[in-house]
Amino acid sequence: MTQNIDTTSQPGDSEQPPQPARAVEPARPTKPQKNLYEPYNTPPVLYHALRAVANLIIAVIIRLRVLGLHNVPTKGAFIIASNHLSWADIPFVPVRLRRKVVYMAKEEYFNSRMAWIVRLLGAFPVKRGEGDRQALRAAEEQLKKGNILVMYPEGTRSRTHTMAKAHSGMGMIALRTGVPVVPVAIWGSEKALKEFRPRVTICYGKPMVFKPVGKKITREDIDQATDQVMRSIAAMLPPEYRGVYAGEVQATGAAPEDPTDSPP
């Protein structure tokens, strides 16, 4: 015979007291992520102090000659477009400018130990090898604010110490914003980290302003603007540095510019 077991709780049976509901902990506030496309706003006092220190160090380690500084606008937004031979180009190219500058720097720098230095210099990232629309918008925004944008259109340092074919981003930004482009030629900087007190020359060319041929900016407009700036840079360089633009300088008959020396 099967015996039925009554499982109903009877009075007096031991019961577990109800557990109080656990209080829900408020979510911890998350630290807002840094917007790397907004350059760090270095305080003016700190920036000019760093600039003074950089000038002092540069005076000790190299013999710097600066040409055509009078070609650089004293106000308003503009682009500095330079050839790129060495890491040293980054502090050398704008070191004699009185105003603060911002840079486009490759994305890898922002994930390295150099990230804090890059941010302090006022740089924002760009993804190389692809059309980084966010970086282009950030560049245009900086120019709309009246800032100076330093660009190295070749995209990286030249391993052969000669000019390589430029990317089109600089030409596109110049056409979209309408700001002047100051071509800059630098040479000798490839020796700055290898020799003691080598001669380094920085030559600032005349500002160039570009407009589209028609109502809309075309690929041809962008390519022509980019090539015109690069030919101007090549024309200021000694022949052995001109690289892929050597033939174009000779073909167009462009004579090397000879800006007068400017005081430091």
Please identify what each model-predicted range represents:
Residues L46, R51-A52, A59-V60, V72-G131, ...:
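Catalytic core of membrane glycerolipid acyltransferases/transacylases, capturing the structured
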Residues A59-L67, V184-W187:
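Short gly/ser/thr-rich secondary-structure transition/capping motifs
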Residues V66, Y103, A123-P125, V181, ...:
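Conserved beta-strand scaffold positions in the cores of enzyme catalytic domains, especially
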Residues L69, N83, K106, G129, ...:
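Generic beta-structure capping elements
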Residues L64, V101, L149:
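Hydrophobic anchor at the start of a short beta-strand
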Residues T2-L46, Q134-P264:
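Non-catalytic C-terminal accessory region of glycerolipid acyltransferases
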Residues R63, A77, R199-T201:
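A residue-level signal for beta-strand positions that form part of recognition/binding surfaces
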Residues H70-P73, Q250-A251:
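A short beta-turn/loop motif at secondary-structure boundaries
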